[in-house]
Amino acid sequence: MDIEVSRIISELYMNGDLLKESSCKCKNNTSVFLDDSSIDRVNCQRNNYKLQLNRVRLEYKSGKKKNDGIIINLPPEQIEGLTKESASKTIKALGTDVTFNYNDETTTCIVCSKEVQEIVVSLISLYYCHPIEILQKFCNKNNQLEVILKSQRRPFENIGSRINLHVKANDVIEFIKLANTEHSHIHDLPRYVRQYIDSFVVSEPQRFNMLFAMASSFAEYILEKGKMGGAQLVEETISYFNNIESLQKVKDTIVKANLRRNGKSISTITELRNECEHNLYSNESYEFFANNPSVNVFMYDIACKIVMKLAGIPTLSDTI
């Protein structure tokens, strides 16, 4: 099948029709669809083109049914030492059964209902503070097995996370069990978790901006405070988590730094955000956060409470 598919894909690419409702049928009752694909990379050797696609959908005509599931870039050893020889691990979580199976040394298969797949992945990402990716997704559809293959962006790294310092969970399984999906904003969790995790791989000025945006968005969309200004929205979020006293300490830190913009003193986190946006890569921005790490620690604590709130997981205390 690989040679046949490769030839058809190459011909479609040369004709400029690769991503225009492309599909091909193979001899073993398999159909390959590229309508949702995009090209990550193209390698050319003479007349042969090797394409790396970010997404491919397969459909198998088969009388056998397979439970809905996904394969993620999490080594199975992270699931209580799951191995090829060991039995699968099934837990009761998120109102359903979630089963973890060994796939290979670097990936784990999770069998659960489609409704909670992204939530499970987000919780695992949150626990490890690392973007967990869905590499394969399979489900039964119209008496066919549909499989979606996705390219991997980053290998798994167990870099540790402060998030597990705030909950009674010794491992990722316990962490997932603590989650509560019975609230109206549970499907917002993946978006906020991505923002939270992404904030760890940028500069400190960028991080401040991202965490500020998280706090603003939480007030506007989750607390439903409406179209306020950014400063008001962030203060609504901070007030919601009872951190007003800590906010005043951050304001005092900003005032003591004697930062100025257009001749005016910077004294609030909103004014600091505006300065960071306009002078993101300035020496002043880097020096401020290097000399005053408590500012981003405060913003991180608010972001941490946001994602924990959306996950339905109570923290060990009201103060992080």
Where are these regions (language model features)?
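Charged/polar positions within long, soluble alpha-helices
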Residues: 220-223, 274-282, 304-315
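Composition- and surface-driven signal marking solvent-exposed, interaction-prone regions
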Residues: 211, 227-231, 286-295
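Hydrophobic alpha-helical packing segments in soluble, helical-rich domains
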Residues: 208-225
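Short, well-structured alpha-helical interface segments that form or flank functional binding sites
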Residues: 191-194, 203-213, 232, 261-271, ...
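Charged, non-catalytic interaction/linker regions at domain boundaries
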Residues: 1-203, 289-320
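Flexible secondary-structure boundary motifs
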Residues: 221-263
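Histidine-centered, metal-coordinating catalytic motifs and their short helical/loop contexts
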Residues: 255-289
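Surface-exposed loop-to-helix/strand elements on domain peripheries
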Residues: 194-196, 234-243, 278-289
